[in-house]
């Protein structure tokens, strides 16, 4: 009599794909190297517990710990075959996951892990690191505000000042969008002081100079620009009018209106391979200096006055205030006189400007 085979039925979904990708990134090994555990720890290592837990979060779209253990229990064979590890349900109890979270909350070890992961990923995938985008966002929630907690009342980007929020600052490879550094801070914190530590971590992890850091107007503080310039890197950001010398904006615009400046066209390559005019403007230079770590740093800011081309191909972004500018060490300004009581409109042309420069 033929023996009846033992058939295992499990829902696979995208789990093998997620786990394979994380293994190629070296995630389990890097986590184990940077977050050592107590000698009495048994079962799966912290790195593998974290990796499988992350695959659960990504596959289910749910970060709650209470659902992880039963999720694993229904996929023991799939997880074991995919990872090559002896996966057990007891490796994912709430107590075990809480220990993992406490270990991962060590800021010093996390910074070292983040740096090692960036270096490994950039090297393995031969990623371009020419441009880094730095920006912050906030997330509101129906949470309880506690002293020293992450959720605090602050300036709400969600237009919900009645809700506490948490703030996230992140630096990503542009245009890929791969995170390089992430900081989660309490919601009442201002954006301006968050740029320097985030950029410094990216510089330490990549170990390269000559990168272009792209940010919004809150990255335009002179301290932030001085640190980037002193490090041998470059920046592209809107420069608020308060950062300009008195009369500089008016003089720069008047030079255009009087016809004293020749405007240079800026083109962008379309998906069909054709070039389209997206803006025109001119450049001038301004000597800059600022004290950084006790030493006076000097650099030359290349400032661009730019008028966006009026065409349906552009997607303008409304601005409430107005004229602002961009600096790469460079500034982009509107060249037209804005109509009275109407917002100034902007279009971002960083890649095209880089090619032009």
Predicted regions span which residues?
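Anion-binding and metal-coordination hotspots
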Residues: 1-20, 25-357
